[in-house]
Amino acid sequence: MKTPLQQLVGSLVIAQACAAGAAEPVDGQQIVRAGTTPAVVGPEATFTGHVRVEQLWPATPQITASGAYVTFEPGARSAWHTHPAGQRLVVVSGVGRTQEWGKPVQELRAGDVVWCPPGVKHWHGASPVTAMTHLAVSGALDGKNVEWMEKVSDAQYTTR
């Protein structure tokens, strides 16, 4: 179940993105109701552990950023990756981790906001014992918003 903050942020952003991305002029707001977008399991090639991705809106010519809720179960994480136009993460629940290549692992908590600059190699996911959900807003450049790399090893994940 989503928290009121998740529902509010998701509803506001979806409404804005849908209205801005419509092919025809719109006389008013468009609303996509919470829970109407199906979640998918994060692919094994780019995630370790159980991850659910709920795509909220796609990048459009009007707003060149996509958005999704990503939920990582305890111990789950992304592979190393970069974003050609950057990514902002808003942790909405739980406890997580992130790491920039060559730097220490950082802990994330609900309410934290992370800016991942373009081209910076990093990963993010849940803590070993607590799930974490974040809202990911990823900029797109030439239709691409991520470059996936190798998986994060258990040693990299557990090193503090």
Label each region the model flagged.
Residues 21-64, 146-160:
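A short, N-terminal "cap"/entry segment at the start of jelly-roll beta-barrel domains
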Residues 97, 104-105, 109-110, 118-145:
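Ligand-binding loop in jelly-roll beta-barrel domains
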Residues 12-21:
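Hydrophobic h-region of N-terminal signal peptides that target proteins for export
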Residues 1-9:
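Bacterial N-terminal signal peptides that target proteins for export
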Residues 64, 82-83, 102, 126-128:
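Short glycine/proline-enriched turns and hinge-like loops at secondary-structure junctions
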Residues 52-55, 66-83:
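Conserved short histidine dyad/triad with adjacent acidic residue
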Residues 77, 82-110, 120:
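A short beta-strand-loop-beta hairpin characteristic of the jelly-roll/cupin
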Residues 80, 89-90, 115, 134-136:
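Structural recognition of the beta-strand scaffold that forms the well-ordered cores
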